[in-house]
Amino acid sequence: MSIGAEIDSLVPAPPGLNGTAAGYPAKTQKELSNGDFDAHDGLSLAQLTPYDVLTAALPLPAPASSTGFWWRETGPVMSKLLAKANYPLYTHYKYLMLYHTHILPLLGPRPPLENSTHPSPSNAPWRSFLTDDFTPLEPSWNVNGNSEAQSTIRLGIEPIGFEAGAAADPFNQAAVTQFMHSYEATEVGATLTLFEHFRNDMFVGPETYAALRAKIPEGEHTTQSFLAFDLDAGRVTTKAYFFPILMSLKTGQSTTKVVSDSILHLALKSEVWGVQTIAAMSVMEAWIGSYGGAAKTEMISVDCVNEADSRIKIYVRMPHTSLRKVKEAYCLGGRLTDENTKEGLKLLDELWRTVFGIDDEDAELPQNSHRTAGTIFNFELRPGKWFPEPKVYLPVRHYCESDMQIASRLQTFFGRLGWHNMEKDYCKHLEDLFPHHPLSSSTGTHTFLSFSYKKQKGVYMTMYYNLRVYST
């Protein structure tokens, strides 16, 4: 049975004009002996969240011991995010069911609790690079618009196999491949062309496993791939992410060279990615080269859709955190001079100063040696475009005092954009989403804030969250 058919059995029709779902009375009331109705005795559907309904109505996917753990740990937050982003009830159920049915099994085995009642990073079955405590799920909330913000919920995951880290699958490559070739992938509209191209160029074979394990630097991750799902109003968009680090260790080439060669290989064989793609990549390579090795290509992503509609994004991490250096990077050292980039730089200046509370644009943020410290950029390549389009990820996890400080400062920036609902409610939303996180005393719930700008869409921002399954 498809997700659509299942959802119709639970929610017979989309919400009506009065805001209630057709077939769902606001209250089921008990008739009293005098003919009146007791409004307090019956079951109020308004008191049940979609998470509650699906928990009661749907069997857990196999293996239930693991998917049950992930549903309890993550399902409530996913449901709340869909509600706060104002998804219609029917769409809320549709996407929460998709998460329940198709995504939960990808999160892998539940952690062994041993003598503890709460998981910790030390007993994570696989050390996912997706979040700093190895939680393999990172939901995010995108807001964009020239006036009031429009919202989209997204989720990033690292699919984890039950043999991840073992001799048969030491780098956790099997689960993502199996999913992308499954019926479940067709349910989320994923196509394979670009996925297979980059998988073939980035994944490593069994003949190299032993040698690569010996080469991995201390403290380095071995994640090979992520998936992400944009829960748009009309459809799901699937994205695949690949890490070039193992292929870099295998070949002795830089991660930038590994990615560049793969894109060149694609452009030479594709009717879609041609000379413009090669030119855009060369602009990026020239900028990366100007840093003398300090800027490193971290990963690459593609939209798993028709090639003509897809994008290739190259993610680069640099150690610099001064506003001046960040703005220089955003425009690729002056190589991007279009109006979108110029206006984006003005807004980025205001956002950075607001979130980090800095005045001096030459001042670096406090020194931090964590593997995920520094500033990340992605540069987007599109078919037919001669230049990449920039996006920056503000590393708030490492450089702010607390998550509530981040939220409060974001509210200030939202107000300047005219996003008054987010200005008024974002702090309250955060507390409701993560009631058990120490939001006022630590960071770790927000991971990054991304920012880009286009005149047609306005400011385009995403707040990324760590559910902190393995940390308190």
Swiss-Prot record:
A GO biological process held by the record: proteolysis
InterPro entries: Aro_prenylTrfase (IPR033964), Aro_prenylTrfase_DMATS (IPR017795), DMATS-type_fun (IPR012148)
Catalysed conversion reaction: L-tryptophan + dimethylallyl diphosphate = 7-(3-methylbut-2-enyl)-L-tryptophan + diphosphate; an N-terminal L-tryptophanyl-L-alpha-aminoacyl-[peptide] + H2O = an N-terminal L-alpha-aminoacyl-[peptide] + L-tryptophan
Single Gene Ontology MF annotation: aminopeptidase activity
Binding site for L-tryptophan: E138
Residues the record marks as site: Required for regioselectivity: G156
Keyword Hydrolase: yes
Residues the entry annotates as binding dimethylallyl diphosphate: R154, K239, Y241, K313, Y315, Y393, Y460, Y464
EC number: 2.5.1.80, 3.4.11.17
Domain of life: Eukaryota
Induction per the UniProt record: The expression of the hexadehydro-astechrome cluster is induced by glucose. Expression is controlled by ambiant iron conditions in a hapX- and steA-dependent manner.
Role summary: 7-dimethylallyltryptophan synthase; part of the gene cluster that mediates the biosynthesis of hexadehydro-astechrome (HAS), a tryptophan-derived iron(III)-complex that acts as a virulence factor in infected mice. The enzyme is specific for dimethylallyl diphosphate (DMAPP) as prenyl donor.
Subunit structure: Homodimer.
Family membership noted in the UniProt record: Belongs to the tryptophan dimethylallyltransferase family.
The protein's name in its UniProt record: 7-dimethylallyltryptophan synthase hasE
Protein source organism: Aspergillus fumigatus (strain CBS 144.89 / FGSC A1163 / CEA10)
